[in-house]
Amino acid sequence: MSNKLSQLKEFTTIVADTGDITAIKDFLPQDATTNPSLMLKAAQIPEYAPFLDQAVAWAKTQSNDKDQQVLDAGDKLAVIVGTEILKYVPGRISTEVDARLSFDKEATLAKARKLIALYEEAGVSRDRVLIKAASTWEGIKAAEELEKEGINCNLTLLFSFAQAQACAEAGVYLISPFVGRILDWYKKSTGQEYTAETDPGVVSVTEIYNYYKQHGYQTVVMGASFRNIGEIEQLAGCDRLTISPNLLEELKKDEGKLERKLLPTTDVKAAPAAITEAAFRWAMNEDAMATEKLSEGIRNFAADQRKLEETLRSML
């Protein structure tokens, strides 16, 4: 019998959640996703040193202002790494907008357009890139405009049904609902242990997947942030799953049978009325888990972005 990774690839598109090109070569995913934390990790890999040098050298030609050079070097590094990864994946790379812009729609638009321009200058067409932004109201509204410009988006740090509903209605290309971080919150909050079936993160993604299929939304559901392969197995059949190299390795070594869990319905119903900004904000406020995890996720990505920038600043 084939291993669970091979079986999973039969009904779910596998995405590698890493900036490590060696890992990508090992697992042959369709796509890859990066974020500020993964970029920070990648920057510490010795083989990536030339990419940092290249980004810094380029930034020096763009501005005489040190602070601007740091920002430019960060953008360029993300694009250099993304371009390199695209040599090994047939699909797309997800590159994240600076998390510090999560509540600024116009700044998110400007940063996204800049990243796409840098990719296009590097010979990478926009149809191979997904721009990642946090699923704040402002991030979702920015994505709605970007989609109209032919810039596809991946809305991340998604923890609630309200976020998923708003993303679908905005026509975003793809969402990344988090699984493991939801489980973390509930375990800490309730003190309970959960099985793969009762895992609140699995339940959340299953509900979102079924809702999207039931209403005919085209937005791709890509489960993210996994703590164990049990969560992945429960979401077998999801449109895409983005998985870290260590869990991809576990799936590859497991020769057991994998059963498909998620299937699209054929009974499509009309979509409900669109969620308003007030209703979105209220739903988020009512959901302590989603509010806390979204805030924490943005803070952590911003902190890692600052650490990466300190490294780049020291090179300027």
Curated annotation (Swiss-Prot):
Pfam families xref list: TAL_FSA (PF00923)
A GO cellular component annotation in the UniProt record? cytosol
Q: Which domain of life is it from?
A: Bacteria
Query: What compartments host this protein?
Result: Cytoplasm
Reactions performed catalytically: D-sedoheptulose 7-phosphate + D-glyceraldehyde 3-phosphate = D-erythrose 4-phosphate + beta-D-fructose 6-phosphate
What keywords were assigned to this record?
Cytoplasm, Pentose shunt, Schiff base, Transferase
Gene Ontology MF annotations = transaldolase activity
What Enzyme Commission number(s) appear in the record? 2.2.1.2
| CDD domains referenced in this protein's UniProt entry, alphabetically | Transaldolase_TalAB (cd00957)
Pathway assigned in UniProt = Carbohydrate degradation; pentose phosphate pathway; D-glyceraldehyde 3-phosphate and beta-D-fructose 6-phosphate from D-ribose 5-phosphate and D-xylulose 5-phosphate (non-oxidative stage): step 2/3
Gene Ontology biological-process annotations = carbohydrate metabolic process; pentose-phosphate shunt
| Major subcellular location class | cytoplasm
Q: Which InterPro entries match?
A: Aldolase_TIM, TAL/FSA, Transaldolase_1, Transaldolase_AS
Q: What is the active site of this protein? A: 132 (schiff-base intermediate with substrate)
* Subunit and interaction comment: Homodimer.
Record's function text: Transaldolase is important for the balance of metabolites in the pentose-phosphate pathway.
Family the UniProt entry places it in? Belongs to the transaldolase family. Type 1 subfamily.
According to UniProt, the name of this protein is Transaldolase
Species for this entry: Marinomonas sp. (strain MWYL1)
